[in-house]
Amino acid sequence: MSIQLPRGTQDILPDDAAIWQYIEQVAKETCETYHYQEIRTPIFEHTEIFSRGVGDTTDIVQKEMYTFSDRGGRSLTLRPEGTAAVVRSYVNHKLYASPAQPTKLYYTGPMFRYERPQAGRMRQFVQFGVEALGSASPQLDAEVLALLIAICKKLGLVNLKLVINSLGDSESRQAHREALIAHFKPSIDEFCSDCQMRLEKNPLRILDCKKDREHPLMATAPSILDYLNEESRAYFQSLKETLDLLNIPYVVDPTLVRGLDYYNHTAFELLSTAPGFGAITTLCGGGRYNGLVQEFGGPETPGIGFAFSIERFILAMKAENVDLPVPQSLDAYVVTLGDEASRLGPQLLQRLRDGGIRADKDYLGKKMKAQLKAADRYQASYTIIIGEDEIAKQQALVKQMATGEQTVVAISDLTSFLQEQIRGGN
């Protein structure tokens, strides 16, 4: 009996890896045009990082984290998201002390959540995210959203819907909190046990409940927008005005709260409206978190960010019939005939590779016909044939596979010849 993959995980095979590499490369290059730099953090962190950062009333902390004790008895957790770890690193390394602010970072890597596996939702998934720390400007919020939209456009995604909301500052959220408690408390027994627990700890989480989303009280719950103080209203208005200037369309949804406790002021989600995308339409989520750095022992520092699952982006690209990249084909395949040519084959192959030419050869002792079939299977642009006669003359027969044209080239000139042909698109 063969050993199978753990449930909720996947192997990314070579034919698919090109798509992943393409999305990551486009996202990285776009981030760098916006002056964001890469950061890498460990795959596991102290559990406290997530219970304090993400919020102990969230589904992620209560139900979805992969937590274990190491041999020293320390509680560690495979990261379920990227923001808390990035902020922890920001504080540990005192990046807030740099005169170059805001600090703009991007990251990519595997995350882990114990969820029911389905299309676009895995227990191990790859996330790409950005964080901008050190500025409380709504224009920075708009820049982060512009960056997200730019990545999507470069990937060919056009069927998009940006949904935004304001969660306000601490004063606004406290007023909204009290209104939510008053609204839900008389009928809280009709809600699930999670909502009952959240009522006093964080009633905003009730609005994010999947079990009770159809309860009549959900539709009539107090809107956060009615409890924003003057400062929070002005902040949200400035964000909307900047998005208008950037020609970024959006929809305001006062029920959008996001599933993490650290958000305040701006919260947003990017949805796919592509037909056939599936039940889970959320492509990306994010928002502002002005208290998280302080929660981790740093100075009061504002921040904003977003993250998306690469798996979901792939689904969206397929739903929109985007031309997906394929693995790069070979530039050249070396066919050797005879013992001496076979002996010298690795040397010739290495010269080509040293010259930046994607090249390969047979390692199974195949006959010439089978080697030529292999060159065709690998979609090599050129086949280089070397036999005993070619070795004696220090020449190689170069065949252009698309046209069948054959050229005799000195072995010493082979690398430069192929470089010129490839550059010229011949």
From Swiss-Prot:
GO molecular function per UniProt: ATP binding; catalytic activity, acting on a protein; histidine-tRNA ligase activity; transferase activity
Keywords: Aminoacyl-tRNA synthetase, ATP-binding, Cytoplasm, Ligase, Nucleotide-binding, Protein biosynthesis
Keyword Iron among UniProt keywords: no
CDD domains for this protein: HisRS-like_core, HisRS_anticodon
Catalytic activity: tRNA(His) + L-histidine + ATP = L-histidyl-tRNA(His) + AMP + diphosphate + H(+)
Pfam families the record matches: HGTP_anticodon, tRNA-synt_His
EC numbers, comma separated: 6.1.1.21
Cellular localisation: Cytoplasm
InterPro entries reported in the protein's UniProt record: aa-tRNA-synth_II (IPR006195), aa-tRNA-synth_II/BPL/LPL (IPR045864), Anticodon-bd (IPR004154), Anticodon-bd_dom_sf (IPR036621), His-tRNA-ligase (IPR015807), HisRS-like_core (IPR041715), HisRS/HisZ (IPR004516), HisRS_anticodon (IPR033656)
Main location as per UniProt: cytoplasm
GO (cellular component) term, any one: cytoplasm
KW Zinc (keyword) present: no
One GO BP annotation of this record: histidyl-tRNA aminoacylation
HAMAP family documented for this protein: His_tRNA_synth
Subunit annotation: Homodimer.
Family, similarity comment: Belongs to the class-II aminoacyl-tRNA synthetase family.
Protein name per Swiss-Prot or TrEMBL: Histidine--tRNA ligase 1
Lineage: Bacteria, Bacillati, Bacillota, Bacilli, Bacillales
Gene: hisS1
